[in-house]
C-alpha cells in the first residue's frame, strides 16, 4: 500500500455546500485515478460556535485554543464527532465513496492526554496504533476522523484538529495537507509565502504578521514537518482545480519545511 495522505479539513468549509461539492467531486476523481489511500481529519470550529451561540454559551479561547469546560465537552463532542462528522459522511455517501466515521480514540489510533488544566477538556494528541485505520484503507474505505479524543481514564477531550492530524500522520507514516480558508500563509502585503521555515515563522510572529489561530496552525505544521521528517502543506480548499496536483505533492499553498 502506498503511504497514505491525510487531508485535514477546517475553516468554514463545513458550512459551504458549494465547497463540499467541489471537494468531494475532486476526491472521487482522485480516488479513481490514483492508488493512494486518503484519510480525512476534521475539526468544526464553526459548527461548535453556532451551537454555542444557539445555547447562549460563551466561547473562550486561550492562545488560539478553545477553552473547554467540563459542562461543554458533551456539546462539543456532539458537534464534532456527531454533526460535523456525519455531515462529511453524508457527502461521501452522496458521491458513492465508502467512508467510515471515527474519532481519535477508535482503535487507539491517536493517544490523548489532558493538555493543561486551565484549558479544561482540551487534549494533547500523540501517535497511537495504525492497525484499525490501515485495515480500513486496505479494504478501500475512506476514514473520516473527528478531532475528539479520549484519555486512558475515559475522559473525552477536544483536540486541535491540526494537532490531531499531525499525530495521526505520525501514526500512519502519512503525508499531511492542512486545508483551510486561506491560500497559505500571507506576508504583510497579503502575498502568499511559498515556503516557510521555523526561523521565518518566528520572525513573522514577532512582527505580528502571523497572529491568533494562524500561529496555532503554523506551529502545528512546523511540529508536523519535524515529527514526520517531511514537508507539510498549508493550502486552500477554495481552488478545487488545484487540489489533485496538491494531493500529488505539487506545492500550491505554503510548504512548511522542518
UniProtKB/Swiss-Prot annotation:
Q: What PANTHER family does the entry give?
A: N-ACETYLGLUTAMATE SYNTHASE, N-ACETYLGLUTAMATE SYNTHASE, MITOCHONDRIAL
Binding site residues for substrate: 44-45, 66, 158
Could you say which residues bind ATP here?
181-186, 209-211
Gene Ontology terms: biological process = arginine biosynthetic process via ornithine; L-arginine biosynthetic process
SUPFAM superfamilies for this protein: Carbamate kinase-like
Give the UniProt subcellular location, in the record's own words.
Cytoplasm
Output the Gene Ontology terms for molecular function: acetylglutamate kinase activity; ATP binding
Its cellular-component GO annotations read: cytoplasm
- Point out the annotated site residues (description: Transition state stabilizer): 8, 217
Keyword Manganese included in the entry's annotation: no
State the source organism's domain of life: Bacteria
What's the name of the protein? Acetylglutamate kinase
Query: In which organism is this protein found?
Result: Shigella sonnei (strain Ss046)
Q: What role does this protein play?
A: Catalyzes the ATP-dependent phosphorylation of N-acetyl-L-glutamate.
Alphabetized InterPro entries for the sequence = AceGlu_kinase-like_sf, AcgluKinase_fam, ArgB, Asp/Glu/Uridylate_kinase, NAGK-NC
Which pathway does it take part in?
Amino-acid biosynthesis; L-arginine biosynthesis; N(2)-acetyl-L-ornithine from L-glutamate: step 2/4
Family from the record? Belongs to the acetylglutamate kinase family. ArgB subfamily.
Ordered alphabetically, the record's keywords are:
Amino-acid biosynthesis, Arginine biosynthesis, ATP-binding, Cytoplasm, Kinase, Nucleotide-binding, Transferase
Q: Does the keyword Lipid metabolism apply?
A: no
Residues spanning the signal sequence:
none
Q: Which reaction does it catalyse?
A: N-acetyl-L-glutamate + ATP = N-acetyl-L-glutamyl 5-phosphate + ADP
How does this protein assemble? Answer: Homodimer.
**What EC numbers are recorded for this enzyme?**
2.7.2.8
Amino acid at each position: 500500500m502506498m503511504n497514505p495522505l491525510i487531508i485535514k479539513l477546517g475553516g468554514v468549509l463545513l458550512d459551504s455546500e458549494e465547497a463540499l461539492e467541489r471537494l468531494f467531486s475532486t476526491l472521487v476523481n482522485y480516488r479513481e485515478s490514483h492508488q493512494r489511500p486518503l484519510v480525512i481529519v476534521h475539526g468544526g470550529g464553526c459548527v461548535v460556535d453556532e451551537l454555542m451561540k444557539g445555547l447562549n454559551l460563551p466561547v473562550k479561547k486561550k492562545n488560539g485554543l478553545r477553552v473547554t469546560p467540563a459542562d461543554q465537552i458533551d456539546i462539543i463532542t456532539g458537534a464534532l464527532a456527531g454533526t460535523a462528522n456525519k455531515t462529511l459522511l453524508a457527502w461521501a455517501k452522496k458521491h458513492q465513496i465508502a467512508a467510515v466515521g471515527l474519532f481519535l480514540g477508535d482503535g487507539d489510533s491517536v493517544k490523548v492526554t489532558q493538555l493543561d488544566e486551565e484549558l479544561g477538556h482540551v487534549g494533547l494528541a500523540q501517535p497511537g496504533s495504525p492497525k484499525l485505520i490501515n485495515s480500513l484503507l486496505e479494504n478501500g474505505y475512506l476514514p473520516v476522523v473527528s478531532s475528539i479524543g479520549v484519555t486512558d481514564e475515559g475522559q473525552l477531550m477536544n483536540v486541535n484538529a491540526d494537532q490531531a492530524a499531525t499525530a495521526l500522520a505520525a501514526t500512519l507514516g502519512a503525508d499531511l495537507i492542512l486545508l483551510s480558508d486561506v491560500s497559505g500563509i500571507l506576508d504583510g502585503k497579503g502575498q502568499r509565502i511559498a515556503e516557510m521555515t521555523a526561523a521565518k515563522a518566528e520572525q513573522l510572529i514577532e512582527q505580528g504578521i502571523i497572529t491568533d489561530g494562524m500561529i496555532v496552525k503554523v506551529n502545528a505544521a512546523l511540529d508536523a514537518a519535524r515529527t514526520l521528517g517531511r514537508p507539510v502543506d498549508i493550502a486552500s480548499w477554495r481552488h478545487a482545480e488545484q487540489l489533485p496536483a496538491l494531493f500529488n505533492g505539487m506545492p500550491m499553498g505554503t510548504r512548511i519545511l522542518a
